[in-house]
Amino acid sequence: MADTDDEHASPQNPDNRIELERQAADEAHKAKILAHPPEGPGGDPLHPPVTPRPGATRVVRDRKGGRRVVEVPSTGHSWDGIEEYDNPLPRWWLWTFYATIVWGVLYLIAYPAIPLVNGATQGLLGQNYRSDVAAEIQRFNEANAPIQAKLVETPLEEIAADPELANYTANAGAAIFRTWCAQCHGSGAGGATGYPSLLDNDWLWGGTLEEIHTTVMHGIRDPKDADTRYSEMPRFGIDGLLENAQISQVVNHVLELGGLPHDAALAAEGVEVFADNCSSCHAEDGTGDRAQGAPDLTDAVWLYGSDPATITRIVRDGPFGVMPAWTGRLSEADIVAVAAYVHSLGGGE
């Protein structure tokens, strides 16, 4: 047992030799400090102030598999007693880095990569992603051409009774809606301020499938479509059609029609103002007129808001919401599909 202990304590043992080399490096470092003590309070070389060490040690392997201790130089960067040493990067990391450089150069040569004025370099493989997308769209259109033709030829009122068409409009219409309509009406079709909800039965221009189809085709107040749905609420305040007192009166009357808190005296005075200026579109009882896109003022649905300040702004400034006409932007089959999808959301009549 004694021989075994001596063997482990021998300098010939690799682990023990490494430890001895570490100790020797530490002794050498301590000797450097004693030979050149840093300046500080008290001038005590054995207890100098905290200063960056000039170096550290680490164990490295040589090509023959042996290990040795080497000194690692410091970069000179130190903060709060923490030093940065100039250790070399791991070999695996370096080779990975070099491999990515080679891969990047090969990709630059093989694929479109360098932008030009009217395009980009095509690369040795001649890859063209735009052509790939166009081919995929063409393949999709060819695959769906039969059912799209059937959809266009089928009367609108018969689409829901055909399982194949009903399934197609539910899926294709939803995809079209998310792409072109959700930006205003919301991904769930719940609408937002100034953009009507498509989930309820409150429709400005009508909620039958035929009426929805017409609205999608021609839009609302789209100057580029001659058949667009059009109506315009006067700017009663900006154009001086009503005085501020009259606007306050008619606003309170509108609040009264909607069952909202209001000033009874002003509302009574606003009845005549409403009859003279608003009833031609909204009807004398405030229930609106779909032929003109005039909303019902007696229900709980408010496109822009139901607070007095918002209603005052609407009467004074006059809203002018616009929906684009989708004829020419979407195919006839796509328009039918999205109209049928909107009609099926729950509020269709």
Swiss-Prot record:
GO cellular component, alphabetical, reads: plasma membrane
Residue ranges in the Periplasmic topological domain are 118-349
Which residue ranges does the record annotate as region Disordered?
Answer: 1-67
Q: Give me the Cytoplasmic side stretches, as residue ranges.
A: 1-96
Q: Which residues form the Cytochrome c domain?
A: 168-258, 265-346
Q: Which domain of life is it from?
A: Bacteria
SUPFAM superfamilies documented for this protein: Cytochrome c
Q: What does the note under cofactor report? A: Binds 2 heme C groups per subunit.
Where does this polypeptide localize? Cell inner membrane
Pfam families, A to Z? Cytochrome_CBB3 (PF13442), FixP_N (PF14715)
Enumerate composition-biased segments (Basic and acidic residues): 16-30
Q: Which residues bind heme c 1?
A: 181, 184-185, 323
The UniProt annotation places heme c 2 binding at 233, 278, 281-282
Q: In which pathway does it act?
A: Energy metabolism; oxidative phosphorylation
Q: Which UniProt keywords apply?
A: Cell inner membrane, Cell membrane, Electron transport, Heme, Hydrogen ion transport, Ion transport, Iron, Membrane, Metal-binding, Oxidoreductase, Repeat, Respiratory chain, Transmembrane, Transmembrane helix, Transport
* Bilayer-crossing regions: 97-117
Q: How does it sit in the membrane?
A: Single-pass membrane protein
Q: Its principal location?
A: membrane
The biological process GO terms on file are: oxidative phosphorylation; proton transmembrane transport
Q: What does this protein do?
A: C-type cytochrome. Part of the cbb3-type cytochrome c oxidase complex. CcoP subunit is required for transferring electrons from donor cytochrome c via its heme groups to CcoO subunit. From there, electrons are shuttled to the catalytic binuclear center of CcoN subunit where oxygen reduction takes place. The complex also functions as a proton pump.
Q: How does it assemble?
A: Component of the cbb3-type cytochrome c oxidase at least composed of CcoN, CcoO, CcoQ and CcoP.
NCBIfam families per record: ccoP (TIGR00782)
What is the protein named? Cbb3-type cytochrome c oxidase subunit CcoP
Q: Give the species.
A: Paracoccus denitrificans (strain Pd 1222)
Taxonomic lineage of the native organism: Bacteria, Pseudomonadati, Pseudomonadota, Alphaproteobacteria, Rhodobacterales
